[in-house]
């Protein structure tokens, strides 16, 4: 298995796990409990700049990104 992929949710800064790593394709994640999708993708190998929408020219501040 690859790195544990998470999304940093935009509302409160909490991290929540993404099912199937989908957040690194869509750039969003579903917040625990409320089902809202928001946030920016990150994982152990990549940290994206603010406003990054993975899949459309993600600019990475650290590491290499498949975005």
Curated annotation (Swiss-Prot):
It comes from the Eukaryota. Coiled coil: none annotated. Pfam families: Metallothio_6. Keywords: Metal-binding, Metal-thiolate cluster. GO terms for molecular function: metal ion binding. Belongs to the metallothionein superfamily. Type 4 family. Metallothioneins have a high content of cysteine residues that bind various heavy metals. This is Metallothionein-A. It comes from Sphaerechinus granularis (Purple sea urchin).
